């Protein structure tokens, strides 16, 4: 009879553990190595912020009203002050909602990167490619332990590509406690999209009719349409390529690529009437700040609404001023420098942990004091990287390996 034992090879620095499963003959059946990055104590990440490279947009893409992918800025929106005293629930019954049960992986981001590389004839120099949402979870980890997360990662051509583990996301939704509030949760989620519709124009103000502007409260809300910015940024020694949705622009894009863009992030929150609500808003500000910080969005406009969804006030926040504003409150719920330093430490550690191909899992259990990383597939890249992107990279490498011809020299 074959028996199994588990030999624990040990813990060192509280950051790495390895499990090897063996049978009675002493031959390995399989091996799983789990590395763990400790979040606590958070105090070790305090102090002056690590150097951050200003996010610079180098490409963009859009989804149209049917959520069809488009290279370019077709779905860019312009900010224009919304009317107040508008019911944010209005039009919910006609809401055109994107089906996010479909796993879109990194497909759109990779297609956009490949298009950029075709124009420049060289690969981007990022150490990590991912969505803004994944980096937001990582940066918020020291102060947000209620919800866990899972991500899939793979190493390809020296770069780590990270996506959300869609199966975990769907399972977490299915296991959520039933909502017992007076207003359905779906309606409250709709309020944010309604506020975006009330606050944006599809063209600059000078090209938009007064009738269109004044009729915005009656417009059908469609969250399938999106503009996504792709930026190059960096935290410490780690260069990042991040893609993420941008709600609107304040004026217009600069002519020179890489120059700062006056983006606007739109958010909603309950009117603050007591200390508990003030504390909740301060916690919300952390996510607001991280999301805008990562893409270089300088301005956040919050629509404050009543408990039943009436928009009563808008307030503008400067992204770079939010951490200091929170710090001045005496007993801050979070610290921006700590978020940056934690992300720097984790990303450097991750780059030394994911060092070969296969599919890796990045996992943080709810209320856990560590982030685990372990391999779930020994070879390949799963569905994280598309065949089209890999074929393009092979083609690019072959092109770069070719010696210059006389024709090429003449063209130059």
UniProtKB/Swiss-Prot annotation:
Binding site for a divalent metal cation: 196, 247, 265-266
Subcellular locations according to the entry: Nucleus
Alphabetical list of InterPro entries matching this protein: RAI1, RAI1-like_fam
Cofactor(s) listed: a divalent metal cation
Its EC number(s): 3.6.1.-
Binding-site residues, substrate: 228, 245, 267, 291
Cofactor mode of binding and number, as noted: Divalent metal cation.
Pfam family, one: RAI1
Family membership noted in the UniProt record: Belongs to the DXO/Dom3Z family.
Assembly: Interacts with exr-1/rat1; the interaction is direct, stabilizes exr-1 protein structure and stimulates its exoribonuclease activity. The interaction also stimulates rai1 pyrophosphohydrolase activity, probably by recruiting it to mRNA substrates.
Purpose: Decapping enzyme for NAD-capped RNAs: specifically hydrolyzes the nicotinamide adenine dinucleotide (NAD) cap from a subset of RNAs by removing the entire NAD moiety from the 5'-end of an NAD-capped RNA. The NAD-cap is present at the 5'-end of some RNAs and snoRNAs. In contrast to the canonical 5'-end N7 methylguanosine (m7G) cap, the NAD cap promotes mRNA decay. Also acts as a non-canonical decapping enzyme that removes the entire cap structure of m7G capped or incompletely capped RNAs.
Designated name of the protein: Decapping nuclease RAI1
Name of the coding gene: rai1
């Amino acid at each position: 009879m074959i028996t199994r034992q588990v030999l624990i090879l040990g813990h060192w620095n509280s950051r790495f553990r390895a499990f090897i499963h063996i049978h009675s003959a002493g031959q390995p059946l399989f091996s799983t190595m789990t590395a763990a990055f400790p979040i606590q104590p958070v105090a070790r990440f305090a102090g002056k912020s690590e150097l951050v490279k200003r996010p610079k947009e180098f490409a963009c893409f859009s989804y149209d009203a049917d959520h069809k992918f488009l290279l370019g800025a077709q779905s860019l929106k312009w900010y224009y002050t919304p009317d107040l005293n508008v019911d944010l629930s209005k039009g919910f019954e006609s809401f055109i909602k994107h089906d996010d049960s479909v796993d879109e992986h990194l497909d759109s981001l990779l297609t956009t990167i490949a298009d950029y590389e075709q124009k420049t004839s060289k690969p981007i120099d990022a150490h990590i490619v991912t969505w803004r949402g994944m980096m937001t979870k990582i940066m918020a980890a020291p102060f947000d332990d209620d919800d866990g997360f899972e991500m899939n990662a793979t190493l390809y051509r020296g770069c780590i590509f990270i996506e959300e583990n869609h199966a975990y996301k769907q399972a977490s939704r299915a296991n959520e406690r039933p909502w017992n509030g007076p207003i359905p949760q779906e309606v409250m989620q709709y309020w944010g999209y309604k506020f975006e519709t009330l606050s944006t124009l599809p063209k600059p103000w000078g090209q938009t009719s007064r009738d269109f502007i004044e009729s915005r409260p009656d417009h059908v809300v469609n969250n399938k349409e999106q503009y996504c910015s792709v930026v190059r940024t960096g935290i410490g020694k780690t260069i990042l390529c991040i893609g993420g949705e941008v709600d609107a622009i304040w004026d217009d894009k600069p002519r020179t690529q890489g120059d700062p863009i006056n983006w606007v992030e739109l958010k909603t929150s309950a009117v603050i009437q007591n200390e508990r609500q003030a504390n909740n808003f301060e916690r919300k500000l952390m996510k607001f700040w991280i999301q805008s910080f990562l893409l270089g969005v300088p301005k956040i406009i919050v629509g404050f609404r009543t408990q039943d969804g009436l928009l009563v006030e808008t307030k503008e926040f400067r992204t770079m001023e939010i951490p200091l504003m929170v710090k001045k409150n005496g007993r801050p719920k979070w610290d921006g420098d700590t978020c940056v330093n934690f992300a720097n430490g984790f990303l450097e550690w991750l780059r030394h942990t994911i060092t070969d191909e296969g599919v890796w899992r990045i996992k943080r259990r709810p209320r856990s004091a560590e982030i685990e990383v372990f391999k779930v597939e020994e070879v390949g890249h799963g569905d994280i990287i598309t065949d089209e992107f890999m074929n393009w990279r092979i083609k690019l490498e072959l092109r770069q390996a070719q010696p210059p011809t006389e024709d090429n020299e003449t063209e130059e």
